[in-house]
Amino acid sequence: VYEQVSIEVPQSVEAPVVIITGASEIEASTIQALSFGPDVXKEADVEAMIKAVDAWGQVDVLINNAGITRAGVIGLQKNINVNAIAPGFIASDMTAKILETIPLGR
């Protein structure tokens, strides 16, 4: 099952699949929301997400809940990339966008 509310339809879904519950309920409400299921370790996915934010105008809430668990040496590196490094890059990029549109102290 794959549910995504976005301006861009994913070309393919590869394992593991991200399940976003409630996205259709949010879409049906009066709230404007955009949810993504990108691979946070892929720069192109993160850039596409940031471009979508540019199209929408601002970020009011950012929930970054990426996380994986893999075994072995290669798995450990992927764990570090997805769980520790990528969220920092996303937060930095999104923080810059937030500061462009929302005055400090709000």
Swiss-Prot record:
Keywords: Chloroplast, Fatty acid biosynthesis, Fatty acid metabolism, Lipid biosynthesis, Lipid metabolism, NADP, Oxidoreductase, Plastid. GO terms for biological process: fatty acid biosynthetic process. Pathway: Lipid metabolism; fatty acid biosynthesis. Gene3D superfamilies: NAD(P)-binding Rossmann-like Domain. Its EC number is 1.1.1.100. It is found in: Plastid, Chloroplast; Plastid. GO terms for molecular function: 3-oxoacyl-[acyl-carrier-protein] reductase (NADPH) activity. Mesocarp. SUPFAM superfamilies: NAD(P)-binding Rossmann-fold domains (SSF51735). The keyword Zinc does not apply. GO terms for cellular component: chloroplast. It comes from the Eukaryota. InterPro entries: NAD(P)-bd_dom_sf, SDR, SDR_fam. Belongs to the short-chain dehydrogenases/reductases (SDR) family. Homotetramer. This is 3-oxoacyl-[acyl-carrier-protein] reductase.
